[in-house]
């Protein structure tokens, strides 16, 4: 069975911006491996969940662990995408407005350099940032890009026909 993760895509529709200026909050992984990687390295906050755990509950937990923010409000299902690794990621979107300066990530231990036998404690996430939808497509992992399409389509359907 492929690994499973659940995640949340926080979005906002800032007032005073041109209509259609949807923004999404993405995270950049911490640690030396990711330090010089930017475009194509960002992701939605997500993490693995156990067989007996509800995916949405796991997504909320992972979001808080990786950002320090509390996810609340209506959660819009975005379905699942499969990453290149084979991992299945199930995601929801919610409207929020977290300040990237307030991001606080959990930490984890890695072996660094690889196969060195040395351990290094790193933040799981070293940065969070708001992106316009077009810019997000450049920075987000390509195997999660479909989640942006689904969010845009979901919000378009909810807003009804243009007048």
Predicted feature locations:
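Short, charged/polar surface micro-motifs in flexible loops or helix N-caps
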Residues: 14-16, 31-34, 50-51, 85-86, ...
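Non-DNA-binding regulatory cores of transcription-related proteins
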Residues: 120-126
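N-terminal strand-loop-strand
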Residues: 1-44, 92
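The catalytic Nudix box helix
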Residues: 44-78, 132
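Short, charged, solvent-exposed linker or helix-capping segments at domain edges/interfaces
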Residues: 19-20, 101-107, 140-142
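Charged phosphate-binding loop/patch that engages nucleotide di/tri-phosphates or the phosphate backbone
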Residues: 129, 133-163
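Active-site-adjacent beta-strand/loop module that shapes the phosphate/pyrophosphate-binding cleft
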Residues: 80-117, 129, 151, 155
């Amino acid at each position: 069975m492929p690994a499973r993760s659940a995640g949340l895509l926080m979005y906002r529709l800032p007032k005073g911006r041109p209509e259609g200026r949807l923004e999404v909050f993405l995270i950049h992984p911490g640690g030396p491996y990711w330090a010089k990687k930017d475009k194509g390295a960002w992701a939605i906050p997500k993490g693995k969940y156990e067989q007996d755990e509800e995916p949405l509950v796991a997504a909320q937990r992972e979001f808080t662990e990786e950002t320090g923010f509390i996810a609340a409000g209506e959660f819009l299902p975005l379905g699942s995408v499969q990453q290149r690794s084979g991992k299945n990621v199930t995601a929801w979107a919610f409207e929020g407005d977290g300040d990237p300066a307030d991001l606080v990530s959990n930490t984890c231990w890695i072996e660094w350099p690889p196969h060195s036998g040395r351990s290094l404690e790193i933040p799981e996430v070293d940065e969070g940032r708001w992106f316009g939808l077009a810019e997000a497509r450049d920075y987000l992992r390509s195997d999660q890009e479909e989640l942006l399409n689904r969010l845009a389509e979901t919000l378009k359907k909810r807003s009804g026909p243009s007048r």
